[in-house]
Amino acid sequence: FDNNDTNYSYHHYGCTDYYKIDPRLGKNEDYLRLSQTAGNHGIKMIIDVVPNHCGGSHWWMKDVPSSDWFNVWKTYTSSNYRMTAWTDPHASETDRYKLTHGWFAPNMPDLNLSNPLLYDYLKQAYIFWIEYAQIAGIRVDTYPYNDIKTAARFIQTLRDEYPNMNVVGECWVKTPAETAYYQSGNNNKDGFDSRLQSVMDFMLKDKLQEAFKENEGWDTGTAKFYSHFAQDFVYPNTNLIMNFVDNHDIDRLSTAYKNVNEYKMALAMLVTVRGYPQIYYGNEIMLEGISGDYQGHRFTFPGGWKNDKRDAFTPAGRTKEENEVFDYLKKLLHYRKNNPVLQNGKMMQFIPENGVYVFFRYNEEKTVMVITNNNDHATVLDTKRFAERIKDCEMGVEVTSKQAVDMKNQVEIPGKTVLVLELGFWR
């Protein structure tokens, strides 16, 4: 939406007109045409819903509709940003109040969603865009900074209008238990239900950026994945957990891994583990960016603008390493798209041994074995340990290379490599 603020306006989280596309990007009609064109290619559009704050230059700041339109303090007061205040059974109301009523940033006034007129205004604005631009999904920004009971009612209002629409919430917390608290259907002791079908796995992001540059240990390297997924019992639906390796708020994956093989390992995990992947533009070419570097992680994709020195949309405009990553991720995503076993199949994992972590995705029709070798050297894996899932399968095919793999006794995995094997697969 329009973000006509004096600074930081490029991030578009400080809306100044809920019914207007930022003119630097185009007109409303251009956005509609984008959605229609995407739909013609089988791509659905998702809208970012921000009920917590608006831009300081919004036109209503000149004539505030009511005294309680915003959360107002005698002097500027920021949020304490302690989202644990909602899940902490010992939390004080003072801390919860400051979390929700304190401002996220000085240039973004904190909206009082409990005001019924504001509630209806935002509801109608988002329904307008869903209808006008044929929006298929919603991402709710900074969900826990709202009064969460009001936010849940707001999300349910939209879901009542669009019962088949998925809603994912940004709940940037630090433990699986806290994340699960915000997934709809969880049996929370306080009875709270967020109405968010999907939640974002920020903890997995940390592990994806760390594990492949660490030595293997009890709780380092790939053991981090094992321990993380072992806590999935707290979630009501692991298929609707959104996974990612980076996004617009944090260092890009390329900051963590300069080694192409390690970078590819993180992408392989992203695409094959339970839940569903979010791909941030530039992941496919190792686009660089550091969060503290003047928001440098939000660099534009090379070739999208007429003054760009190269066009990374084409193979000729990409380096050898970029093409390697691009082709690898493309093959993984195509496989995932065409194989429900990676979309909603069950997952079974085995404790990492000797630097190798193995897990399976499986359903009644298909079994996929993912072998992660975090060693710098090739490692031989005895397949007998995994008999309960491999069963009597004698062959597998690595889905990105199409190479056949003999599963009868031992499999050799190159160093710093992930093998994604479809078992019992021949062509």
Which stretches of residues belong to each language-model region?
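Substrate-binding/active-site clefts of carbohydrate-active enzymes
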Residues: F1-F128, Y132, A151-D160, A177-E178, ...
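The substrate-binding groove and active-site-proximal loops of carbohydrate-active enzymes
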Residues: H12-K27, F104-Y119, A136-Y145, Q209-W218, ...
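Active-site-proximal helices and loops of the catalytic beta/alpha 8
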Residues: S35, H53, A125, E131, ...
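Hydrophobic faces of well-ordered beta-strands that scaffold small-molecule active sites
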Residues: M45-I47, I138, V167-G169, N243, ...
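Surface beta-strand/loop "capping" patches
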Residues: G345-E365
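Asparagine-centered strand-capping/turn motif at beta-strand->loop junctions
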Residues: I371-N375
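Solvent-exposed beta-hairpin/edge-strand motifs
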Residues: R385-S401
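C-terminal beta-strand-rich structural cap/linker in extracellular carbohydrate-active enzymes
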Residues: M407-R427
